[in-house]
Amino acid sequence: VVIEAVGLSDLKRFYDLAPKAATELARIAINQSAERVGLKLAQRAMAAQVNFPRGYFSEIGRSGKPNFGMAYRATNANLEAGIAGRQQPTSLSRFATERGRFVGGRHRRGTPITVTVQPGRVTTFKRNAFFLRLRNNNIGLGIRLKNGEILTNTHGAKLITSGPLKGVALLYGPSVDQVFRTVAVDISPEVLDALTFEFLRQFELRSADL
């Protein structure tokens, strides 16, 4: 999602007064409104829809970037900033109440696993789901399928086709990117208001030097 200077309806008037300063102040306003307002509003809106675990947005993934954050910042040459979320589906184990017990070695295989993807909507796997350790110290939630069985209502379930786990499907919930795109339009007006306010505030602070 992009935050850019075209949202500043009065920008041309300020460019006519002080083009160099207007560019610099627009850059500052875009970056600050994206980081201080856009990110926080989006995280709050996403958390209301999907039960992402605490701290998940700031976790650093294999790409070296956080699961949700600034993709790039505005520069004087390019007056736009980008916000992006992790595009890979989120392991369903992240939404499981018993995940912490598994990490601590206290969860016995075959006992029920409770998953809450959407706040207030709980799904319990009685016996057929289990945690398993994956590469890079990740933890997955899997379910062993019967011959000919097909999964429905999943977000990119991955079927293991060889080895001792052949026939096990790794289960996933929505990606951060997917959820972010559903809330981006709703938060846009407030982000634009913050952008306009910050630009005018910065211009007022600098007006004596122009």
Spans of features found by a protein language model:
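Short, Lys/Arg-rich flexible segments
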Residues: 1-210
